[in-house]
Amino acid sequence: MTTTNWSLKVDRGRQTWEYSQEKKEATDVDIHLLRLKEPGTHCPEGCDLNRAKTPQQAIKKAFQYFSKVQTEDGHWAGDYGGPMFLLPGLVITCYVTGYQLPESTQREIIRYLFNRQNPVDGGWGLHIEAHSDIFGTTLQYVSLRLLGVPADHPSVVKARTFLLQNGGATGIPSWGKFWLATLNAYDWNGLNPIPIEFWLLPYNLPIAPGRWWCHCRMVYLPMSYIYAKKTTGPLTDLVKDLRREIYCQEYEKINWSEQRNNISKLDMYYEHTSLLNVINGSLNAYEKVHSKWLRDKAIDYTFDHIRYEDEQTKYIDIGPVNKTVNMLCVWDREGKSPAFYKHADRLKDYLWLSFDGMKMQGYNGSQLWDTAFTIQAFMESGIANQFQDCMKLAGHYLDISQVPEDARDMKHYHRHYSKGAWPFSTVDHGWPISDCTAEGIKSALALRSLPFIEPISLDRIADGINVLLTLQNGDGGWASYENTRGPKWLEKFNPSEVFQNIMIDYSYVECSAACIQAMSAFRKHAPNHPRIKEINRSIARGVKFIKSIQRQDGSWLGSWGICFTYGTWFGIEGLVASGEPLTSPSIVKACKFLASKQRADGGWGESFKSNVTKEYVQHETSQVVNTGWALLSLMSAKYPDRECIERGIKFLIQRQYPNGDFPQESIIGVFNFNCMISYSNYKNIFPLWALSRYNQLYLKSKI
């Protein structure tokens, strides 16, 4: 019997890890997620440890295993960690506000930080596979010290050595400067302004915050509040020690105004434009003479928006950065109020435990997203009817995750329509997303063919289609959460230094192709729907957009996965679903591109450096997820070179573990081009999906 102190609890998608002083028998889900057994050796009921030799055997084993690690509310839980700059915000917020994390949680966070330390130079990077930099190293160092790790601990000494040898914490990027300032370990005069008065600008101005990408908007909203108030934690003995430890000169002798644009070369990815530097200079001058009346008005206005975001998301907030900064704002405004404790309770939603320790995820999970893909993979296997309980549960989660109504006062708070949409994670989170809605629609429609499932009504699915129709941009494409509201030149104001394309919500091939697929599937189920002509026009415009952004080599640049393999999978699937002829030059070129990247072992492997450089970079080894995407693309397009496809299928069968699981390989997700993020369920979903499609397309064998 395998035992554990930790177990995952779920409730309508909410995931929380609970600690017990006494070890308890581990569930299949716990064993899978925590790797309590050697990978490939855990054998849930109904599985065996005989290696698959045929595609049909591999499909059956993959389905059997993955169905056993489904949570009791129907979703598939997974690790959505990877970024290293998130957890320190939580640790600093708890320290500043005096909120005590449980000792068991603190131990696991410390274990994670040590496990993810670069063994060569002692630093940390922007994400778990990145080179060490000042942002990552400073914030993890500070976190370890705040959590009680002494300054003379060998790993801490090694990190401090790296930090000081590379210029110290004065070269940390702006988000790091912000967190250090709130801790009282950095002077507010060393930051470029985060002008809270911007929030009073009318929406008809192109630079108004309501026109920004929602993640950018919701991060800089509470940051501007904290900057305006100069909210700062107490100057404790530990903070005084940190002031001595992380800088290359005495804290009191640092010229803080000279540090505003001091960003280490190790960190710099997106440099400030000349225009931004001029504006920052003007804002620094304004900061000295700002109107108190106007600032107080802006503070009240922004806190109202912060409160709205908290309440609409049940204190989850759109993401982990504004989650912790919002919590800090509530503490500054109200102290340890009921709202503060609602915030504190929702910290658990972001903390994820895995084999390497406890991390902060890039969202409150990827529950709906992973479940929708899993449903589609299972449906294409041809054996979904053999796993009725699993499919019923998955359908249940899809059902309870659809957003039932629009957010209140949408226009005032810059929100888009929500009714009928699907979120990335949970209905409590509730932010509608174009491709999540599309995948939800596709999954709901696919499940209608199973007679033992209570289907989601076509009226409810049509609500989702309505959201997609409102989200289409003028260029024919779809962005992520909202329409593109601002001009592209707003990117000249990007102050982040480490991310690109943060200022507005751009049209993406992934979102556009997913929406085309969803609407194409819907019109087959509802050919006489009142909006069918609009749907047809929307699909045609979307196809034109996808073709317009295809690169000369036939690929599409992925913005949410790695990278050209991912983007090209969406590009091909979108065109094929729309009815584009398979002889279309766009499809032929795309297939040729993918085939040219196949490796000697039959697989595909793409490095995250493709996203960073925007040029295809081969990984050191083939990856099961990249291989799954490439094979799905080629088979969707009926690529004529069957040998190419069969070599990929053989690679997947060889890589499958005897129990039906697949190996966790390199990081596979990305956002804003420079930061990678984990999708641990992808290793199970996409190989199974590719194997299933191969069997349906070529073998047509019963399993």
UniProtKB/Swiss-Prot annotation:
GO annotation, biological process:
cholesterol biosynthetic process; sterol biosynthetic process; triterpenoid biosynthetic process
Supply the PROSITE patterns for this chain. TERPENE_SYNTHASES (PS01074)
Note the SUPFAM superfamilies from the entry: Terpenoid cyclases/Protein prenyltransferases (SSF48239)
Q: Fetch the InterPro entries from UniProt.
A: SQ_cyclase_C, SQ_cyclase_N, Squalene_cyclase, Terpene_synthase_CS, Terpenoid_cyclase/PrenylTrfase
Q: Which UniProt keywords apply?
A: Isomerase, Lipid biosynthesis, Lipid metabolism, Repeat, Steroid biosynthesis
Which residues does the entry assign to the active site, renumbered to this chain?
Answer: 435
Record-level Gene Ontology MF annotations: cycloartenol synthase activity; lanosterol synthase activity
Which GO terms of the cellular component aspect does the record hold?
lipid droplet
Q: Catalyses which reaction?
A: (S)-2,3-epoxysqualene = cycloartenol
**Pfam families (UniProt xref):** SQHop_cyclase_C, SQHop_cyclase_N
| Repeat keyword on record | yes
Per the UniProt entry, the Enzyme Commission number(s) are 5.4.99.8
| Tagged with keyword Magnesium | no
The top EC class is isomerase
Return the PFTB repeat spans.
59-103, 106-148, 461-503, 539-579, 587-628, 645-686
Q: What does this protein do?
A: Converts oxidosqualene to cycloartenol (in vitro).
Question: What does the similarity note say?
Answer: Belongs to the terpene cyclase/mutase family.
Name the UniProt record assigns to this protein: Cycloartenol synthase
Gene that this polypeptide is encoded by: cas1
